[in-house]
Amino acid sequence: MAATASPGASGMDGKPRTSPKSVKFLFGGLAGMGATVFVQPLDLVKNRMQLSGEGAKTREYKTSFHALISILRAEGLRGIYTGLSAGLLRQATYTTTRLGIYTVLFERLTGADGTPPGFLLKAVIGMTAGATGAFVGTPAEVALIRMTADGRLPVDQRRGYKNVFNALFRIVQEEGVPTLWRGCIPTMARAVVVNAAQLASYSQSKQFLLDSGYFSDNILCHFCASMISGLVTTAASMPVDIVKTRIQNMRMIDGKPEYKNGLDVLVKVVRYEGFFSLWKGFTPYYARLGPHTVLTFIFLEQMNKAYKRLFLSG
C-alpha cells in the first residue's frame, strides 16, 4: 500500500515540503559543533602529542593516556577543554561551508532525470567541498592549535588567548592578517586526503566484509567497515596533519620562521624525532574520528526531525 503524505507536509504543487538550504547548512554546522563539545579533549591530546618532543628524540608524553593524565594533573578538568571556543568556530565555518559547497555541486551535477553523480564525481565533489571548507576554517584552526598547545609551555612563554575571538584579534594585531591562513595548504591537503581515503576505504572495506561470507549488508557490517575506514583515513592523513599543527603553532626565531614549508617539517620530524613520529597522536585522532562523525549525524537527524515537526507538519 502506497504511503500518503500528510496534508501539511506538501506544498501547493503537491511536492513534499523540505527544509530550505540555509536551514540545512545551519543544522550541519550546529551538528558539528555539538559533536565537538564531546570530542574536544581528544583533539587537545592529539595536538599536544604532535608537538611533544618537537626537534628531539625525547617526548613529553609516552602515550596518549599519559598525556591525558598529565594534562588533568597540571591543568585540571577545565584544562582538557582548552580551546573549545576555537573548536566550535572551526566547525561553524568548516562544516557549514563544506556542506554548502557539497550540496550545491551535487545538485548542479545531478542529471535532469534525477540521476545522481557517479562515484568518481562524488569523490571529486567531496574533495572540492572539503578543501574549500578547510580554507574558510583555517583561521579558527590556527587559533585552536595555539590555544590547545599553550598549557604545555612555561607561563612566561604562553600566548594566553582568552577565547577564539581574542586569539584572532591578537594574531591580526601582532602578526598580520596573512598569519590567520598560516598552514592553509596542509589544512586543505588534509581535507582532500580525508575525503578521498574515507570514500575509497569505506566502499572497499564493506565489499571485502560482504565477500568474506561472515557479514550481510546490515548495521554491523557498516560499523566494521567504518572502523576500518577510520583506521585507513587516520594513517593516511596524520603526516599531513602533523605538518599543519607544527606550522600553525610555530614562532619566529630571530625574525625567521621555525619551518620554511611543509616539506621542511616532514624532513625535520623524520631526522630529529624518527620516522614514526609522523603518526604522533594516532590514538586520540582515531578515537575522535568515529565518535565525532556518529554524533554529528545523530544531532543532525534530531534537528531535522524537530524542524519538520515544528514547521513542515500540521
Swiss-Prot record:
The modification N6-acetyllysine is found at K256. It is found in: Mitochondrion inner membrane. The modification N6-succinyllysine is found at K57. Gene3D superfamilies: Mitochondrial carrier domain (1.50.40.10). It catalyses: (S)-malate(in) + 2-oxoglutarate(out) = (S)-malate(out) + 2-oxoglutarate(in); malonate(in) + 2-oxoglutarate(out) = malonate(out) + 2-oxoglutarate(in); succinate(in) + 2-oxoglutarate(out) = succinate(out) + 2-oxoglutarate(in); maleate(in) + 2-oxoglutarate(out) = maleate(out) + 2-oxoglutarate(in). InterPro entries: Mito_Metabolite_Transporter, Mitochondrial_sb/sol_carrier, Mt_carrier_dom_sf. The chain crosses the membrane at residues 24-42, 83-101, 119-140, 183-202, 222-240, 281-300. GO terms for molecular function: oxoglutarate:malate antiporter activity; transmembrane transporter activity. The modification Phosphoserine is found at S6. Interacts with SMIM26. It holds the Pfam family Mito_carr. This is Mitochondrial 2-oxoglutarate/malate carrier protein. Keywords: Acetylation, Antiport, Lipid transport, Membrane, Mitochondrion, Mitochondrion inner membrane, Phosphoprotein, Repeat, Transmembrane, Transmembrane helix, Transport. PROSITE patterns: SOLCAR. It comes from Bos taurus. SUPFAM superfamilies: Mitochondrial carrier. Solcar repeats lie at residues 23-108, 117-208, 217-306. Catalyzes the transport of 2-oxoglutarate (alpha-oxoglutarate) across the inner mitochondrial membrane in an electroneutral exchange for malate. Can also exchange 2-oxoglutarate for other dicarboxylic acids such as malonate, succinate, maleate and oxaloacetate, although with lower affinity. Contributes to several metabolic processes, including the malate-aspartate shuttle, the oxoglutarate/isocitrate shuttle, in gluconeogenesis from lactate, and in nitrogen metabolism. Maintains mitochondrial fusion and fission events, and the organization and morphology of cristae. The N-terminus is blocked.
